[in-house]
Amino acid sequence: MENKPQILQTKSKNTPNKGGKLSINDFEIGRPLGKGKFGSVYLARTKTGHFHCAIKVLFKSQLISGGVEHQLEREIEIQSHLQHPNIIRLYNYFWDAKKIYLILEYAPGGEMYKQLTTQKRFTEAMAGKYMYEIADALSYCHRKNVIHRDIKPENLLIGAQGELKIGDFGWSVHAPSNKRQTMCGTMDYLPPEMVNGNSHSDAVDLWAIGVLCYEFLVGKPPFEHENQADTYSAIKAGRFTYPDFVKKGARDLIGKLLVVDPRRRCSLQEVKDHYWVTSMLDSCRRAAEKQKAERAASLRDH
C-alpha cells in the first residue's frame, strides 16, 4: 500500500511555533475570497507585521477521498519554486490534524473570471496586455520545465496594479523527457492532441492562451457548443468563427495559436513580439500615462 505524504496523514500535525513553523494562530482571518471543491480561500494578515496574504484552507479527508493528494503535493512543489510578477507566490504552507493551509500572495483585483463575466468582454488593449503578461509567465514556467495545462479565466487573478497573475497550479506538471498522455484541464480549453488521446508537450499551453485570447475579446470560448461531442469535433478540426468586431491583428495571433498540429503553433516569444500585442501594450501605456498626468493636474488645481 502506498504511503501518504506526511502532510496528508490524518494524525500528522506540526507543533505551532516550534522550530519556526507557522500555525493558524499566527494569522488574523478575514473575509472569504473564494470556495473550491476541497476547501476555501480567505483574506488574512499576519499578527506580527500585519502582512496581507490569502490562505487556502484544504481538508485532508476531502483531498484523500477525491484522490488528489498527489496533485496537491505537485502543486506545492511547483508553485513554491516559482517567482514571477505574473504568477501568484506560494510563500509557505503548514498543516494540522485535519487541514492543510497554503499561504499565498493576495491579489486585490480578484478573479479574472468574475471581471470577464461582469464586463462581458475586455477591450482590445486590455486583452493584448494580458496576452503579453501570460506569455511572459508561461515562458518562465516552460524554461523551468513546468507545463501549466489548465489555463482558463477561473485560474487567473488580477494584482494590485491590474496585472494578470496565474493562480492555480493544480494540474501543472514538471515536463518529463517523454511526453504525457493524461487527460486534464477544462473541456473548452483542451487542445486537439489531448482530445485525441495523443501525447502532449508544453504546446498545450499555447493552444490554451489562443482560446483565452478569443474569450477575452468575445466573452466565450471559440469551441463552445451545446453538447460535448460537437465541442470535441470542433476542437479536433480547429473549427471556429470570429464575430465581425474581432479585428485583424487579434485574429492573426489567435489563428497562429489555435493550430491543430502542436509543432506549428507560434512560440511564446512570438506572442510577446506579435504586432497586435505590442501595439495594445503601447495603448495601455499611453492610457496609463494620460491618467497619471490628469491625476497630477487635478492635485495641482486643489
Swiss-Prot record:
Compartments in which it is found: Cytoplasm, Cytoskeleton; Chromosome; Midbody
Reactions it catalyzes: L-seryl-[protein] + ATP = O-phospho-L-seryl-[protein] + ADP + H(+); L-threonyl-[protein] + ATP = O-phospho-L-threonyl-[protein] + ADP + H(+)
SUPFAM superfamilies named among the record's database cross-references: Protein kinase-like (PK-like) (SSF56112)
Cross-referenced Gene3D superfamilies: Phosphorylase Kinase, domain 1, Transferase(Phosphotransferase) domain 1
PROSITE patterns listed in its UniProt record: PROTEIN_KINASE_ATP (PS00107), PROTEIN_KINASE_DOM (PS50011), PROTEIN_KINASE_ST (PS00108)
Keywords: ATP-binding, Cell cycle, Cell division, Chromatin regulator, Chromosome, Chromosome partition, Cytoplasm, Cytoskeleton, Developmental protein, Kinase, Meiosis, Mitosis, Nucleotide-binding, Serine/threonine-protein kinase, Transferase
Biased composition (Polar residues): 1-17
Keyword check for Transferase: yes
GO CC list: centrosome; chromosome passenger complex; condensed nuclear chromosome; cytoplasm; kinetochore; midbody; nucleus; spindle microtubule
Positions bound to ATP: L33, G34, K35, G36, K37, F38, G39, S40, V41, K56
Gene Ontology molecular function: any one: protein serine kinase activity
Alphabetized InterPro entries for the sequence: Aur-like (IPR030616), Kinase-like_dom_sf (IPR011009), Prot_kinase_dom (IPR000719), Protein_kinase_ATP_BS (IPR017441), Ser/Thr_kinase_AS (IPR008271)
Active site per database record: D150 (proton acceptor)
Gene Ontology biological process terms from the UniProt entry: chromosome condensation; establishment of protein localization; meiotic spindle midzone assembly; mitotic spindle midzone assembly; mitotic spindle organization; regulation of actomyosin contractile ring contraction; regulation of cytokinesis
Region annotation (Disordered) ranges: 1-23
Entry's EC annotation: 2.7.11.1
Quaternary state and interactors: Interacts with zen-4 and icp-1. Part of a complex containing at least air-2; icp-1; csc-1 and bir-1. Interacts with tlk-1 and bmk-1.
Designated name of the protein: Aurora/IPL1-related protein kinase 2
